[in-house]
Amino acid sequence: MNTEEIASSCFQRTAAVLQVNSRTVRPMRDFFVERLGFELGTEIGSGPKFVTLDRDGQTIMLACHRTFGFRKHGWAAYFWVENIEALHDEFERRGAKLKSPITDKPYGCREIVAMAPDGREIVFGEITGTQAD
């Protein structure tokens, strides 16, 4: 038995990521807010290009494609976690294919991206509370 203590992480919540085939997520954002009763969370980019929407403790993300058509791959899900370093170490021990090391993002999260077998990205982020202007 290994007596070495291994740090562990804790999953807090998850969000589906809908890829919007448009230069803006505005119509979809308005649909979720005005017709389905979601509240606007984060909004990034002009148009906007990305939003989070919340209702009853559940979150959905809307993201624009970077080209006119659907991207072949992109975010499929986002998990908020505690202790991103421990999760990164666990994924490396398990042989997960990671897109990059832990990365500090301007929207106040530290993230790692695991690559699914079909090429989609499963993103894990820890909120740091430090958001760039």
List PLM regions with ranges.
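Short, charged/polar, Gly/Pro-enriched secondary-structure boundary elements
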Residues: G57-M61, G119-I122
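Short beta-turn/strand-loop junction motif enriched in small, turn-promoting residues
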Residues: G37-F38, H65-T67
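N-terminal beta-strand motif that seeds the catalytic metal site of vicinal oxygen chelate
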Residues: M1-R29, G57, W75-A77, E126-D133
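Core segments of cupin and vicinal oxygen chelate
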Residues: Q19-T59
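Active-site/binding-pocket entry motifs
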Residues: T59, R66-F68, T130
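A short beta-turn/loop motif at secondary-structure boundaries
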Residues: I44-G45, F68-G69, K105-P106
